[in-house]
């Protein structure tokens, strides 16, 4: 009986540690920081990023840092839709140091990993995986980062699995990007992170 009770206590203590945490509350940008002049706002419970008058890069980063985690989110691209999800990243002004899991129009390597202000493309998905993207519809992306390994999925399709020492040394927040050039609008919902 003591072993059973101890097992139950261990499970109850561990559950909150592996529970999903919402990154977006559906009503405001509490817990986030805006970088740049591009537009980030809430519309009918959805998080929206949209090109502003400067047509520059813009970022929305979490106030908290996340090292090892499993992130799921949904996005819907409108217009050009070029965006991304940064991991273990820091932002100064509109310069981000870190790694982006690409969110882009068809044929532009959604799910691949790009290192900003560094080595550029680290890995792109195989071309046939591009059909997993549903332009103009809701898409589900999953990103798992543990140590020096990153994996991404798009609508349950495995996109990449990559190991990199530099990523393993990274520290920082999760950030959403709006690309420069103007004419971009992306809607986001159900951003859930599980710290590991």
In which residue ranges do the predicted regions lie?
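Sec-dependent N-terminal signal peptides
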Residues: 4-15
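Carbohydrate-interacting regions of secretory-pathway proteins
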Residues: 19-196
């Amino acid at each position: 009986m003591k072993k059973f009770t101890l097992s139950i206590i261990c499970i109850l203590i561990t559950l909150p540690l592996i529970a999903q945490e919402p990154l977006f509350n559906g009503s405001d940008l509490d817990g986030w920081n805006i970088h740049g002049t591009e537009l980030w706002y809430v519309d009918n419970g959805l998080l929206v990023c949209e090109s502003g008058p400067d047509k520059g890069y813009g970022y929305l980063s979490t106030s908290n840092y996340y090292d090892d985690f499993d992130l799921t989110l949904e996005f819907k691209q409108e217009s050009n839709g070029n965006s991304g999800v940064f991991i273990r990243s820091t932002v100064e002004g509109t310069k981000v140091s870190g790694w982006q899991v690409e969110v882009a129009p068809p044929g532009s390597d959604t799910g691949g990993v790009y290192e900003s202000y560094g080595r550029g493309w680290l890995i792109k998905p195989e071309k046939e995986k591009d059909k997993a993207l549903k332009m103009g519809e809701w898409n589900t992306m999953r990103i798992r980062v543990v140590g020096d390994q990153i994996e991404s999925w798009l609508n349950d399709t495995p996109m990449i699995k990559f190991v990199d020492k530099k990523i393993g040394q990274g520290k920082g927040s999760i950030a959403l990007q709006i690309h420069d050039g103007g004419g971009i609008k992306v809607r986001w919902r159900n951003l859930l992170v599980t710290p590991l």
